[in-house]
Amino acid sequence: MARRPARCYRYQKNKPYPKSRYNRAVPDSKIRIYDLGKKKATVDEFPLCVHLVSNELEQLSSEALEAARICANKYMTTVSGRDAFHLRVRVHPFHVLRINKMLSCAGADRLQQGMRGAWGKPHGLAARVDIGQIIFSVRTKDSNKDVVVEGLRRARYKFPGQQKIILSKKWGFTNLDRPEYLKKREAGEVKDDGAFVKFLSKKGSLENNIREFPEYFAAQA
């Protein structure tokens, strides 16, 4: 039997139905890679952050997420190279979709008249997204902005509903605005920690702070 179209599962009509010991035999998600590009780039290397934001309350199938990820990655890799960006998928398909299979194809002599709205068996996975929720985030250099925006614009066509492309005011994937990050970096109050940063805490253990930020305390002494 062919896969039921994702438009049948577009809207959030029911409660979340995740995989559990009561909900078994769930098929694997189609999307397995959530970070791609230059994942090990430091915070200072990619200051610009661009988001693809949902503008509707809906469900995105794992097949659609995988198709959009491939589409955006292929365009940005072809134009600017795979080391020019870091793309992160921000939603995960945990909601299990169900189907009540009934024979209605050419092989059946008559249409099967089963119970309408029956419970059904696990059929696929989808991510439940809210209005204003981030679907994709990409960090890159300022000079690569147009390429990233175009890549996310192409990825939008893989999703139902409406999405917006937003240029973030934050520095990369951190939660600091650009001027605030530069100020803290000059003062030595932040330290690279992969795609994120560690902050100098004004509270807590002094020994840990001295061990994590020796330059800051050496300058104060």
Curated annotation (Swiss-Prot):
There is a cross-link at residues 40, 101 (Glycyl lysine isopeptide (Lys-Gly) (interchain with G-Cter in ubiquitin)). Coiled coil: none annotated. It is found in: Cytoplasm. It holds the Pfam family Ribosomal_L16. InterPro entries: Ribosomal_uL16 (IPR047873), Ribosomal_uL16_CS_euk_arc (IPR018255), Ribosomal_uL16_dom (IPR016180), Ribosomal_uL16_euk_arch (IPR001197), Ribosomal_uL16_sf (IPR036920). The modification Phosphoserine is found at residues 143, 205. GO terms for cellular component: cytoplasm; cytosol; cytosolic large ribosomal subunit. One of its GO terms (biological process) is ribosomal large subunit assembly. GO terms for molecular function: structural constituent of ribosome. Keywords: Cytoplasm, Isopeptide bond, Phosphoprotein, Repeat, Ribonucleoprotein, Ribosomal protein, Ubl conjugation. Its main location: cytoplasm. SUPFAM superfamilies: Ribosomal protein L16p/L10e. Residues 167-216 are annotated as: 2 X 15-17 AA approximate repeats. Sequence repeats lie at residues 167-181, 200-216. Gene3D superfamilies: 3.30.60.300, Ribosomal protein L10e/L16. It comes from the Eukaryota. Component of the large ribosomal subunit (LSU). Mature yeast ribosomes consist of a small (40S) and a large (60S) subunit. The 40S small subunit contains 1 molecule of ribosomal RNA (18S rRNA) and 33 different proteins (encoded by 57 genes). The large 60S subunit contains 3 rRNA molecules (25S, 5.8S and 5S rRNA) and 46 different proteins (encoded by 81 genes). Component of the ribosome, a large ribonucleoprotein complex responsible for the synthesis of proteins in the cell. The small ribosomal subunit (SSU) binds messenger RNAs (mRNAs) and translates the encoded message by selecting cognate aminoacyl-transfer RNA (tRNA) molecules. The large subunit (LSU) contains the ribosomal catalytic site termed the peptidyl transferase center (PTC), which catalyzes the formation of peptide bonds, thereby polymerizing the amino acids delivered by tRNAs into a polypeptide chain. Belongs to the universal ribosomal protein uL16 family. This is Large ribosomal subunit protein uL16.
